[in-house]
Structure formats: structure tokens, C-alpha cells
Amino acid sequence: IDVSLVGSEMCIRDRVGTSGISEEHLSELTKLFTNSNCIVVPNFSISAILLMHLSEIATPYFSTIEIIEFHHNNKIDAPSGTALATAEKISQNMTENLHDPTTDLALEGARGAKAQGNIPIHSVRMEGMLAHQEVIFGSTGQTLTIRQDSSDRSSFMPGVLMAIKGVPNLTGVDVGLETLMDV
């Protein structure tokens, strides 16, 4: 926020790349950027944004949904901000919360953490991975898996460039790369 304070006073266009930004910080940024522009981007991966969008579209057609996110072993938060954002977007297209039929857990947490809409999120932290997420949808006799993989940090650069080029066309504070995409 301190860097953005200087930027807003100088009418500098700002790009903030962070996951898990609080509503309080967003509110502060909104107050700061009244005469200039700022975009807060929790995830610069275009494929992750498209995964969330496609998941929203698929949601009404399936009765069960689970999210599995995989990240490198140095990521300290779980679940990822992208997994939580995906669950939030999915839950907005649900007519009712999901029901988990599991009644006997041999190991606590085996069904994942429950996010909005009672959507299970499973987090994997492992060497050899960077950032991956899949959303699995199921209904009678069929499943659909939507998966996104970032195997190299260079995969975030097209999103960074999109934010740099797009922020002059925004007003105030916008959140998410999707505000610059036609989704």
C-alpha cells in the first residue's frame, strides 16, 4: 500500500500482483486511486483466468464439483487464492450448496477443506511443480475435468504485459486480469 500511495499521488498507473489481498487493502487502494488507475491482479496466468470462466459456465450442468490445486513445495498458503476464487465464482452459479455423501471418514481432512458452496478444495505441495489447478465436475455417468498448468514462471508474462498495456484504459481500481479480457 505504501508504494501505491506514492503512485496515486503522482498519478502513476499502478499494477499490483498479489493473491489474498484483503477487502481492507482494496478499500484503501480505491480511496488512493481516484485520479489515476490501478489494477490488482491475484493471478497473471491467462489459462487460470480461463479455467475459472469455463468452470462458471459448466457449474449448472453438474451435481458434484471438486477443486484440486497443486503448487511448489515453497508455497506457504493453502488453499491457493486462485482455488478460493474459483470456488467463489463456481458457488455464484450454483442453485444450492453441494452435499457430501461421505459419512465415515477414516482420516480427518480426507475430503478436503470446504469452501463456499461446500465445494471441497484439495491442496498439494510438492517438489517439481509450479502452479496447477483442476476442477472436476460430475453427474450421472459422466465427468468433466478442466485443468490449468503453469510449468514455468514465464507463463505469467503475457498476463503481466496485458495488465501493463490495459491499465491506462481503466478508471480507479479494478481487480483481476479478467477485467481486461473478453470473458
Language-model-derived ranges and their functions:
Residues 50-62, 78:
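Rossmann-like NAD(P)H-binding beta-loop-alpha module
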Residues 63-68, 72-183:
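C-terminal substrate-binding/catalytic lobe of Rossmann-fold NAD(P)-dependent oxidoreductases
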Residues 31-40, 139-146:
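Glycine/charged-rich beta-loop-alpha catalytic/anionic-binding loops adjacent to active sites
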Residues 17-38, 53-57:
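Rossmann-fold NAD(P)-binding glycine/threonine-rich loop
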Residues 19-21, 43-45, 70-73:
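Short, ordered loop/turn segments at secondary-structure junctions
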Residues 13, 36-39, 66:
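Proline-centered loop/turn at the N-terminus of a beta-strand
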Residues 1-7, 11-12:
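Single conserved hydrophobic/aromatic residue that forms the stacking wall/gate
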